[in-house]
């Protein structure tokens, strides 16, 4: 089993290195169809050289030279002091108060009368159900794999 894993990883590494070392012009990612009808469809979809001559060609250098030399972050700048909504602050306070116990405590009736209180209650119920579901899934997955003492070498 270990030998198979090592061969698989070596094959993956060799393939990755081979693809990385090829120039971009030589990289072939298309699968070659063996069916005659599939080859006919692909041959119809290919663009003739006459159509290519009509299109203006843009070299890679042209694309690079037109781009500004500014590096931008894809993320928005984060505010150092974010303003949290009141419901999130209340939820954090409730979590800190019930940190020692796993069971959720019942909220005061005044909290349940507001929509924020109702949303918090639903959120806590969903979180509790999700935690139970995750625990059951992990327990099931652990039961699928035999303990190390039961594994027999071939």
Swiss-Prot record:
| Spans annotated as Disordered | 51-115
Q: For this UniProt record, give its keywords in alphabetical order, as a comma-separated list.
A: Glycoprotein, Membrane, Phosphoprotein, Signal
UniProt-listed Pfam families:
GLYCAM-1 (PF05242)
Q: Where is the composition biased (Basic and acidic residues)?
A: 51-65
Spell out which residues are annotated as carrying Phosphoserine.
48, 53, 57, 59, 65
Annotated glycosylation sites = 34, 96
Q: What membrane topology is annotated for this entry?
A: Peripheral membrane protein
Give tissue specificity per the record: Highly and specifically expressed in the lactating mammary gland.
Q: What is its main location?
A: membrane
Q: Where is the signal peptide?
A: 1-18
Choose one Gene Ontology CC annotation of this protein and give it.
membrane
Taxonomy, superkingdom: Eukaryota
Q: Where would you find this protein in the cell?
A: Membrane
Family per record: Belongs to the PP3/GlyCAM-1 family.
Per its record, how is this protein called by name? Glycosylation-dependent cell adhesion molecule 1
* Native organism: Capra hircus
The lineage is: Eukaryota, Metazoa, Chordata, Craniata, Vertebrata
